[in-house]
């Protein structure tokens, strides 16, 4: 409302100032007659080709601001009058409808739900006043009732997953320990077997030559025994028994051993010595020690040097 009054005051002051400058009356400006007269003069001057619209306004002594005010005021007045008429119409219709409603309104006392039972209102915090903490306890029971099933399901699933994971870890650890234990047992048995085995150093080519020589000698001895058989065929049984007794007696008295009883060795047998002093400790020759320690997982300094020399060389880090 204050803004509308301010606009009206500014409009009145502008009308008075424009009327003084141009000599036009306020009624002519508000009705639009002044604008029509100015447009007619400007059109006449521009059609003759003498000057433009701005020059015509300057010739008549009217500035562009004054001409804009004269052309805007009639439009503003018409719109304001229409708005006021619409507001009066709406206000009149509202007054008429209000009077009709008051005339048709029934002011009797309603009888709907007159016999309905009424429940007295009680403050929800009344129980908490009489029994402090009962509302919190009821809320906790409600939470447990609503969330109990889901909570038990989640906890049970978590416990089951923990049991499965722990069982899997325990089984993996037991299997790993059993595998390591069996491997150590096997390697320990293999090491003890190598320690107690009879070792022989042999030369394979020389052994083959010796075997061929023994075969040739056995063939020649077969032919010689056949000739001896035919040569000794004339001996009678008593003579043969006497000869056998004489040969057996010579063997029992440390005599020469027949060639058939001589066992040829395929190589040089390595002699193992026990621990001195009867300590009953495990003894291993020096040449077998790296093998035994390797089976037990230990590496001697000599082997470490060999592995470091023969293994891949580490690349030098570039600076």
UniProtKB/Swiss-Prot annotation:
GO terms for molecular function: DNA binding; structural molecule activity. Residues 306-319 are annotated as: DNA-binding. Residues 266-301 are annotated as: D1. It holds the Pfam family Polyoma_coat2. Keywords: Capsid protein, DNA-binding, Host endoplasmic reticulum, Host membrane, Host nucleus, Late protein, Lipoprotein, Membrane, Myristate, Transmembrane, Transmembrane helix, Viral penetration into host nucleus, Virion, Virus entry into host cell. A motif (Nuclear localization signal) lies at residues 311-319. It comes from the Viruses. InterPro entries: Polyoma_coat_VP2 (IPR001070). One of its GO terms (biological process) is symbiont entry into host cell. GO terms for cellular component: host cell; host cell endoplasmic reticulum membrane; host cell nucleus; membrane; viral capsid. The keyword Transmembrane applies. The chain crosses the membrane at residues 287-307. A lipid is attached at residue 2 (N-myristoyl glycine). Belongs to the polyomaviruses capsid protein VP2 family. Isoform VP2 forms homooligomers, and heterooligomers with VP3 in the endoplasmic reticulum membrane. Interacts (via D1 domain) with VP1. This is Minor capsid protein VP2. It comes from Murine polyomavirus (strain A3).
């Amino acid at each position: 409302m204050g803004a509308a009054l301010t606009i009206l005051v500014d409009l009145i002051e502008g009308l008075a100032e424009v009327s003084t400058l141009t000599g036009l009356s306020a009624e002519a400006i508000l009705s639009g007659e002044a604008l029509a007269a100015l447009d007619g003069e400007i059109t006449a001057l521009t059609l003759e080709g003498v000057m433009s619209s701005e020059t015509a306004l300057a010739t008549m002594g009217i500035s562009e601001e004054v001409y804009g005010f004269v052309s805007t005021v009639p439009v503003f007045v018409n719109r304001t009058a229409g708005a006021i008429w619409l507001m009066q119409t709406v206000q009149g219709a509202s007054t008429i409808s209000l009077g009709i409603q008051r005339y048709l309104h029934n002011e009797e006392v309603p009888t709907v739900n007159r016999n309905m039972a009424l429940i007295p209102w009680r403050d929800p915090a009344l129980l908490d006043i009489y029994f402090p903490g009962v509302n919190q306890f009821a809320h906790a029971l409600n939470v447990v009732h609503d969330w109990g099933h889901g909570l038990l399901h989640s906890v049970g699933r978590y416990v089951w997953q923990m049991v499965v994971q722990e069982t899997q870890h325990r089984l993996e650890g037991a299997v790993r320990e059993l595998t390591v234990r069996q491997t150590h047992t096997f390697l320990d048995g293999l090491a003890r077997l190598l320690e107690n085995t009879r070792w022989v150093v042999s030369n394979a080519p020389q052994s083959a030559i010796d075997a061929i020589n023994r075969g040739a000698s056995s063939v020649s001895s077969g032919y010689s025994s056949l000739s001896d058989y035919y040569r000794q065929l004339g001996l009678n049984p008593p003579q043969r028994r006497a000869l056998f007794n004489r040969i057996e007696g010579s063997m029992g008295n440390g005599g020469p051993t027949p060639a058939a009883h001589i066992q040829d060795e395929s190589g040089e047998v390595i002699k193992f010595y026990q621990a001195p002093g009867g300590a009953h400790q495990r003894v291993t020759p020096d040449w077998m020690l790296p093998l035994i320690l390797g089976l037990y997982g230990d590496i001697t300094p000599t082997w470490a040097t060999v592995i470091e020399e023969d293994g891949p060389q580490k690349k030098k880090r570039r600076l």
